[in-house]
């Protein structure tokens, strides 16, 4: 009974988020949900890691491991095992979900790979950077990235929560493994990464989001 109530609440929350749509946000969140626009930010973060750490290769390999674990657990194991239909494929929600540009995603949605991968990256790099501003920026990005999936109607809130759990677990496992295999790759000081490099990451990330918002404003404003 409680489980069914939770599922119904999950549907109601999804419809509330997805239902608050506008032409501006349709394009905005469609672009936010994509991966290409985040390449500059990812490259800058990798550049800062390589520039700062002598054992950068180990750190990068651990990042790849964290994301790979999150992706495989969510997509290859959990989705087919749980087999929960995405909102866009759920017969009981037919005609209720706002679909953007015909995008409906794959058949199953629990857990969200976007949420798993983004939070794996966010948590692992936060543990490496050990900087509060960076943590706010990167987790803000992960939340925005994950929210876009609900706005587009391809994931329920519980899909996102499950993805966050898988992603954070993967990041912790990768971090502990790195700490055991190559302890010197783990920064011991909060000042290992220069503040100017954190600001550089912030500028690139905010320009990416701001550029999309500004472009949409001129299109729909």
Question: Which role fits each region the language model picked out?
Answer:
Residues 1-40, 74-102, 221:
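N-terminal transmembrane-helix/juxtamembrane module of multi-pass inner/ER membrane proteins
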Residues 19-27, 51-60, 151-156, 189-193:
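Membrane-helix interfacial "entry" motifs
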Residues 32-49, 61, 114-117, 137:
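Hydrophobic alpha-helical transmembrane segments
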Residues 44-50, 143, 165:
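Hydrophobic transmembrane alpha-helices of multi-pass, membrane-embedded glycosylation machinery
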Residues 46-50, 70, 74-83, 126, ...:
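Membrane-water interface at transmembrane helix exits
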Residues 46-73, 135-136:
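Interfacial segments of alpha-helical transmembrane regions
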Residues 61-73, 77, 81, 165-173, ...:
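Hydrophobic, lipid-facing residues on alpha-helical transmembrane segments of integral membrane proteins
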Residues 98-221:
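Membrane-embedded catalytic cores of phosphoryl/pyrophosphoryl-handling enzymes
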């Amino acid at each position: 009974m409680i489980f069914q109530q939770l599922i119904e609440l999950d549907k109601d929350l999804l419809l509330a988020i997805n239902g608050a749509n506008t032409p501006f946000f349709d394009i905005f969140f469609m672009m936010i949900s994509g991966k290409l626009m985040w390449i500059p930010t990812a490259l800058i973060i990798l550049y800062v890691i390589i520039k700062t750490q002598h054992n950068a290769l180990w750190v990068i390999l651990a990042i790849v491991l964290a994301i790979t674990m999150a992706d495989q657990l969510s997509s290859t194991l959990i989705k087919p095992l749980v087999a929960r239909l995405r909102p866009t494929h759920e017969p009981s929600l037919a005609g209720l979900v706002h679909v953007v540009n015909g995008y409906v995603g794959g058949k199953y949605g629990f857990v969200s790979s976007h949420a798993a991968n983004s939070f794996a990256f966010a948590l692992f790099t936060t543990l490496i950077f050990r900087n509060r501003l960076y943590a706010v920026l990167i987790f803000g990005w992960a939340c925005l990235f994950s929210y876009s999936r609900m706005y587009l109607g391809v994931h329920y809130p519980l899909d996102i929560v499950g993805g966050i759990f898988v992603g954070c677990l993967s990041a912790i496992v990768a971090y502990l493994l790195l700490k055991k295999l190559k302890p010197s790759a783990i920064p011991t000081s909060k000042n290992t990464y220069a503040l100017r490099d954190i600001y550089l990451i912030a500028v690139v990330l905010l320009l990416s989001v701001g550029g999309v918002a500004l472009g949409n404003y001129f299109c729909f404003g």
